[in-house]
């Protein structure tokens, strides 16, 4: 970066070598240029400086991980400090990298003595010396902690504390108002990171609540019968590689949703395999809806063929059919209703019986169907 001889410009460059000094979270974002100008020679030079100001752009620096990024937040090496002192203020007796010295070195660098390494060091040091640096660092670490396992969260907190201590050891910090552009930048990105953490936490919390709800549903289902607790034969047969005692011990195990996929699957299988096995056995015992046993259906068809002219069994006949087939009366009623709709068309005489509403009982009992059905006088074994 170059600057005019009659102005002082301090663009905050966040790209460059990270081996000589601290880094900050803002290196991963595009940031506004912080520039101060001094007017000395009129409108032409101001216009030239403004064009130069608009041409600056900050480069994103991609870190391999947040831990590597935080571990890079260490004070500059003694060699780097000596390099800055020898280039910018060799006669200064103040402590290295004090806030006033940073400002003085920044002015010298803007006058033509800067280098990529020195400018990067100065920008990093200036940000770390800002009063809001610890707040910014904490907001960044909180974003990284969302959804992280407990051990990773502990390492992040430890690294954050080390980085804050490293920043404090660099010397006295600046005060608000000395650099309004930097103040505005730090405030804006702190607020942005806080909002980002809130947006990250919202779906994570919803997922945790959903998992807890599902776990409660599993427990309510499994506790409905003694066999589903892992004590029954179904659970023992289901777990050939384990024992029922092991299943009981796993009932109070906490399933960590942050575990790896394979580990999580293993925990769920160990905890709920007995429950699921028992439920499966109970479901298999239930008959499929809409399909009657073959033998019972054949007996109903035999009765249907013998009474095809008028396939309306009486209540006594239904009881006899229920006893012989093992079905309940509701199943028998439904079967005859469906069978008549699909396979029965009354004859002309029967149509007259159905349509004659004036003397239905007399016609039914006297002329057409006067003889009682055989089923009224025989046992269910003869159907």
Swiss-Prot record:
Region Disordered, residue ranges: 37-58
Protein localization: Nucleus
Domain of life assignment: Eukaryota
InterPro entries: ELK_dom, HD, Homeobox_CS, Homeodomain-like_sf, KN_HD, KNOX1, KNOX2, TALE_homeobox
Signal peptide: none
Lineage per the UniProt record: Eukaryota, Viridiplantae, Streptophyta, Embryophyta, Tracheophyta
Ranges of residues in domain ELK: 263-283
GO biological process, one term: carpel development
Gene behind the chain: STM
Stored PANTHER family: HOMEOBOX PROTEIN TRANSCRIPTION FACTORS
Designated name of the protein: Homeobox protein SHOOT MERISTEMLESS
DNA-binding region (UniProt annotation): 284-347
Family named by the database record: Belongs to the TALE/KNOX homeobox family.
Task of the protein: Required for shoot apical meristem formation during embryogenesis. Probably binds to the DNA sequence 5'-TGAC-3'.
Any one Gene Ontology molecular-function term assigned to this protein's record: DNA-binding transcription factor activity, RNA polymerase II-specific
Keywords: Developmental protein, DNA-binding, Homeobox, Nucleus
GO cellular component: endosome; microtubule cytoskeleton; nucleus; plasma membrane; plasmodesma
Biological source species: Brassica oleracea
